[in-house]
C-alpha cells in the first residue's frame, strides 16, 4: 500500500482558501509490525482564521505560541476541558505505542497488599531490573488500573512482547514484591504466602492483528479522568526503544467528507474499483473526522 507521493501539491492545500474554506487532509500512520491507520480530517480556514485573530488580540507573534505562566502546581485545580484533553492525548499515546509494540501477550500483575501507586511503580521497576539481569529481552507498555471496589488498590495491565517462561515472570514478580519488605525469595510463592499473581493471555498468531488492536484499545481505556486529576503526571509506563514512526499528511482534492474518504482510499490502494467500494472498516464519529483501520485480508485484488 503505497501513497501517491508523486501527485503534485499534496503537501499544501489543493484549493485556494478564499474559494474553499473547508478542505480535507489525510494522515497516514505507519507501524513497523502492524498495518497502518488512516485519518481523513476536515480543515476549516474559518477556525484557523479565528485562531490567528485570537493570537493577534493577545499580542502574540504566532497562534501556536501560548503564553507561558510557569509550571502549574501539582495540586492546582484543572478544568474539565483540560482533563479531557489530557485524557485523549494519553489514550491515543497508549494505543499507538501498543500497536507499534505488537505485543505477544497481555499480562496482568496483581498484588495482595494494597499499596500507593508510587510504591507499585518501584516494584515494577525492580521486576524489570530482575528480568534484565536474567538476560530476558522484552518490551512493554504498562498502565495501572484502580480496583473497582477498592480505589486505593492498583494493579497493572501490561502489553508484553518477548519470549520467556511465564513462571519466571511470576517468580521475579514475587521477588520484587517481597524485596519491598526486605525479604529475599527465589521461588514462586503459593497459596496464602503468594504476594500477588501474574495472569497471562497469549496472542495467537492466526488472529494477531485483530488481537493487537483489541489489546491497544483495552489498555488505553484505563486512562481515566480521575487518575489524571489525582496524579497529574504520566499515566502509563512504556519501555525504552518503542519509537513511533512520524505520521505523513497529504492534502486531498475532495470537498465533502465522502469525496475525501474515497480519494484517500484510492490514494492508498484501498478502493475496490471493480465494485466502486472500500471494504475496509471506516469509522465516522462526526463530519470532521473519519478513521480507516486497514485489514490486509480486505485489500482489493491486484490489477493483473
Language model features by range: what are they?
Residues 1-152, 161-304:
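Right-hand nucleic-acid polymerase module
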Residues 156-158:
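Long, low-complexity, serine/threonine/proline-rich intrinsically disordered regulatory regions
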Amino acid at each position: 500500500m503505497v501513497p501517491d507521493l508523486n501527485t503534485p501539491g499534496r503537501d499544501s492545500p489543493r484549493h485556494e482558501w478564499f474559494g474553499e474554506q473547508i478542505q480535507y487532509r489525510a494522515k497516514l500512520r505507519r507501524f513497523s509490525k502492524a498495518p497502518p491507520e488512516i485519518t481523513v480530517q476536515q480543515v476549516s480556514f474559518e477556525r484557523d482564521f479565528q485562531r490567528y485573530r485570537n493570537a493577534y488580540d493577545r499580542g502574540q507573534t504566532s497562534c501556536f505560541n501560548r503564553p507561558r505562566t510557569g509550571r502549574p502546581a501539582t495540586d492546582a485545580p484543572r478544568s474539565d476541558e483540560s482533563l479531557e484533553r489530557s485524557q485523549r492525548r494519553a489514550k491515543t499515546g497508549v494505543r499507538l505505542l501498543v500497536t507499534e509494540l505488537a505485543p505477544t501477550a497481555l499480562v496482568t500483575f496483581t498484588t495482595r497488599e494494597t499499596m500507593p501507586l508510587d510504591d507499585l511503580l518501584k516494584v515494577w521497576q525492580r521486576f524489570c531490573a530482575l528480568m534484565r539481569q536474567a538476560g530476558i529481552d522484552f518490551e512493554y507498555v504498562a498502565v495501572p488500573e484502580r480496583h473497582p471496589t477498592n480505589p486505593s488498590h492498583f494493579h497493572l495491565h501490561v502489553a508484553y512482547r518477548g519470549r520467556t517462561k511465564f513462571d519466571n515472570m511470576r517468580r521475579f514478580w514475587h521477588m520484587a514484591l517481597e524485596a519491598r519488605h526486605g525479604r529475599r525469595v527465589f521461588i514462586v510463592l503459593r497459596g496464602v504466602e503468594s504476594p500477588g499473581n501474574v495472569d497471562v493471555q497469549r496472542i495467537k498468531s492466526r488472529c494477531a492483528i485483530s488481537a493487537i488492536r483489541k489489546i491497544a484499545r483495552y489498555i488505553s481505556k484505563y486512562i481515566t479522568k480521575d487518575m489524571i486529576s489525582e496524579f497529574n503526571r504520566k499515566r502509563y509506563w512504556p519501555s525504552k526503544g518503542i519509537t513511533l514512526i512520524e505520521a505523513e499528511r497529504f492534502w486531498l482534492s475532495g470537498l465533502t467528507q465522502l469525496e475525501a474518504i474515497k480519494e484517500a482510499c484510492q490514494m492508498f490502494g484501498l478502493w475496490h474499483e471493480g465494485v466502486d467500494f472500500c471494504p475496509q472498516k471506516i469509522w465516522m464519529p462526526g463530519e470532521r473526522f473519519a478513521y480507516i483501520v486497514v485489514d490486509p485480508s480486505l485489500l482489493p485484488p491486484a490489477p493483473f
